[in-house]
Regions:
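Solvent-exposed, non-transmembrane loop/terminal regulatory segments of multi-pass membrane proteins
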Residues: 217-218, 225, 243-289, 295, ...
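Generic recognition of flexible, low-complexity loop/linker segments
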Residues: 267-272, 282, 302-307, 320, ...
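A structural signal for short secondary-structure junctions
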Residues: 273-278, 309-312, 395, 403-410, ...
């Protein structure tokens, strides 16, 4: 809280905040300002992303249902669930990470999904002649279990993020899970109440999908074997391209918003002075004795100076050496100084004789004599037995920038700034390696650190973190399904859309060479949790529902699956406009994953079910008539 307050004070005090110095434009820049401006951008974007997601979902629902009353029935449980979750956030969180805003977009899509499946089944039962009470009873008895199971898998997907080593993802995990829980509770309790209210109205307000998706519902019956072969080929090709994924090398792109005024000002200044002053690296070492540390620091300074002269990649550096010298060096300097003081009378006599014999005017000779006397006075005022002291204490403050005591040791810090043209991530690594190789000759180990190094350490294990959290989510989903489903075949069939969608997502990311930010670890759990929802309705309707069939279940689920998939996609689309790369990337990855899950759920999965059904029928014993020998 202190840093934003201090920055606000600086902005008020700089000249361009007032009426004076109108011709001078001042800028605040540097690492702290980068982070502050990026946070301010997030604060502005949070509300915009929420409103855009809400508007996109609302527009989509209105274009599909074409009834304001139907949209109100669908959105009311959603608004109730999100409102409860924001109240929960307010009670338990002091700060919200930008990535957590992804949970809001997810809730806008998934929260609508629960209501869409329930209202869609109610509409179907009413069209078949059932009463309102019968429609509600059958809906909750047959469609309710898949909705509950889908919500449970979504919550497990979010909760798996709590096993991450990154605090932002942990926060996203429990807030996303709580949001799904609140939205589910709101939906299950409000839909019956809203249905009773709608039934009493003279006009039919029960939601009815006005867009036909019949061509998709029939697609799986046309060459199902070819559908399975093509889907398998696409998934295998995606796995091949997925092998090329790697984390984003432009680390400041990952952690800071793009197109910021502070970074633009920093780049202009860096180009002007040929030094990337805002992103220094730090070389540090620990010693037990200050004098030993000062001697090592002088050696380190010499190594850096040689690297500067030889490679021209280091623009400048600062260390304690320009403020303090080792006692041994000071004694040598004092000895040389005392020699000058002792020989001063001889030097003064020689100077006066030379001045007398010169052809200088009296005025010029007088000026030179005054300068010589001033130099004598300066030497006389120096005390070589005591170090220079700053009466205002600023020297002590400045020394603390380069040397501090940590427990029983003293840590020395050297600030190193690279040239402004050293921007390529690989080139930066090479310069780091060259410095570390050069300092190996020092008697103490030297460490390298800085903002870039810290960012790189966070991102370096992204891929392993992705598969670790993904495996947790996968195992949790499979376990839940094995407990609920009466046979493993149903579990395997439900996994087809989510596993295929995840593989295709990674393949597209690898093919497009998109660098992975830390938000990538959300992708596997979310796709595993959400990609399975619609598949459950098809599998349960085909295999485990009374008088169910593949064609009947697919025809029933397809319209609702298309609407729910589109609403989930709309929840993520608004993130594509974000200036924060992790949010933008999460939106893009989830859109790819959800788009991929649609054909896998509505075409590939029914095709697999149809082939299994035909194989089962074809395996029945046949009667063979013996042929008489000729």
């Amino acid at each position: 809280e202190a840093i934003p307050k201090k920055i606000a004070e600086l902005r008020k005090s700089i000249p361009n905040a007032g009426d004076q110095f109108k011709d001078i434009k001042w800028h605040l820049t540097g690492k702290v300002i980068f982070q502050q401006e990026s946070s301010e951008i997030f604060d502005r974007e949070s509300f915009v992303i929420l409103i855009c997601s809400f508007a996109l979902v609302l527009t989509l629902l209105f274009s599909i249902y074409r009834s304001f009353g139907s949209v109100v029935l669908l959105m009311t449980p959603l608004v109730g669930g999100i409102g409860l979750n924001y109240g929960f956030m307010y009670l338990i969180c002091n700060e919200i990470n930008p990535v957590v805003m992804g949970a809001t977009g997810v809730l806008l899509g998934l929260g609508t999904e629960y209501a869409e499946h329930l209202w869609g089944r109610i509409r179907e039962e009413l069209d078949n002649g059932a009463s309102h009470e019968e429609a509600l009873t059958r809906t909750y008895a047959q469609t309710g279990p898949p909705v509950l199971l889908g919500a449970l898998t979504g919550m497990l997907a979010f909760l798996s993020l709590c096993l991450s080593r990154q605090s932002a993802l942990i926060q996203l995990g429990y807030l996303g899970a709580s949001g799904l829980a609140f939205t589910l509770i709101s939906t299950l309790f409000l839909v019956p109440a809203l249905a009773v209210i709608a039934a009493k109205r003279p006009k039919d307000y029960f939601p009815r999908i006005r867009v036909s998706f019949e061509f998709i519902a029939r697609s799986f019956k046309v060459h199902p074997a070819a559908v399975v072969i093509v889907s398998t080929a696409v998934i295998l090709a995606s796995l091949y391209y997925a092998s090329g994924i790697s984390y984003e090398r432009d680390l400041f792109k990952v952690f800071l918003a793009r197109n910021m005024e502070s970074t633009t000002s920093s780049e202009i200044i860096s180009q002007k002075f040929h030094s990337d002053f805002s992103k220094p690296i730090y070389l540090s070492f620990d010693v037990e004795d200050v004098q030993e540390g000062l001697m090592v620091q002088r050696e380190l300074d010499g190594i850096i100076e040689k690297l500067m002269d030889k490679y021209h990649q280091i623009a400048s550096f600062d260390s304690i050496s320009y403020l303090m010298s080792p006692d041994a060096i000071r004694k040598e300097n004092a000895k040389a100084f005392n020699g000058v003081v002792e020989s001063w009378p001889t030097l003064e006599q020689t100077f006066k004789e030379g001045l007398r014999n010169s052809s200088l005017s009296k005025n010029a000779a007088h000026v030179m004599q005054e300068a010589f006397d001033a130099t004598k006075g300066l030497f006389s005022s120096l005390d070589t037995d005591k170090p220079l002291q700053d009466k205002n204490g600023f020297a002590d403050l400045e020394c603390s920038w380069y040397m501090t005591k940590i427990k029983d040791k003293y840590r020395f810090l050297t600030h190193v700034r690279y040239a402004d043209d050293i921007k390529d991530p690989q080139q930066l690594k090479e310069v780091d390696a060259r410095i570390m190789k050069a300092v190996r000759q020092l008697p103490v180990p030297v460490r390298i650190s800085g903002t870039r190094q810290a960012m790189e350490e966070i991102l370096s294990d992204l891929v392993s973190e992705l598969f670790r959290l993904g495996s947790y989510a996968f195992a949790a989903v499979v376990l839940i399904f094995l407990i609920i489903f009466p046979q493993p075949r149903g579990v395997a069939l439900c996994l087809i859309p989510m596993v295929g969608a995840f593989c295709i997502t990674l393949g597209v990311l690898g093919l497009t060479k998109l660098g992975l930010p830390f938000s990538i670890v959300c992708v596997a759990p979310l796709i595993f949790g959400f990609g399975i929802h619609n598949g459950m309705h098809i599998v349960m309707g085909s295999l485990f529902e009374d008088k169910g069939s593949i064609e009947k279940a697919t025809r029933r689920v397809t319209p609702r699956a298309m609407v729910t998939s589109l609403t989930i996609i709309m929840g993520f689309v608004s993130m594509l406009s974000s200036r924060l790369y992790p949010l933008e990337f999460l939106g893009a990855a989830m859109v790819i994953g959800m788009v991929a899950s649609v054909p896998l759920t509505l075409i590939t999965l029914p095709a697999v079910l149809l082939l299994l059904e035909r194989r089962k029928k074809g395996s029945a014993p046949e009667t063979h008539v013996p042929v008489a020998p000729q």
